[in-house]
């Protein structure tokens, strides 16, 4: 699958990323894609500066409880039966928890998952009004700035993506486990180190959080609060983000600067990732693809781009 004129990976061991920005797609073709079909591919950026698209469709969300039970999970990994995620994220969560269980680690529970815009508005209003009651002299701008420190404006929270969730530890009657701080527990450490293998990334790195030596990305993510929040991006993207130590904002910027990359593992081509600018205005668009493999997925990034991930 490797083109003769491609640069060679710099190592035959582990992950190696080759920049193919100046190399065309092999065996090129074109497909027509609908926005809705690629909205939830995993790379939709939702943050303080990039609000969830107005045509976002939440109809395929599933109850974590119902989904987990349908997959044979008997242990309660949900805090309540109302918690929802999109199936791709729920699946990645279950895969990660199964792997943790095989490593002897259990007790993970989802603290929070999808929030609708109206749920987010309710939380926003409550915090805004609480602050207003305590600081009657503050201007509206001051109140908004203060509210933003703990609650995102509706549409700008990662919880509004349906691809993210927070975790904590709880087992009925297990006082020792229930007292544990997630980030200091073996369960937490395992999840931080291994979640990328299942397509999940730790979303909001801060200085020395979740682990010592972590460099803060708050200036990129806009979030400066310690949260054990994991976000589904898909295994190929999580692999690159882990290897390059990038948050989601940095990864999308990286693909804007390097819109065609190949990812090798132990010298073998594993993924090819291509970003094309398609804009946010069309409900369908024409996309260039490589017909070298039919095994590919696509995702909008909410920055006007469409990212195609080929798996070999």
Regions found by a protein language model. Give the residues of each.
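Extracytoplasmic cell-surface/polysaccharide-interacting catalytic and binding patches
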Residues: 1-312
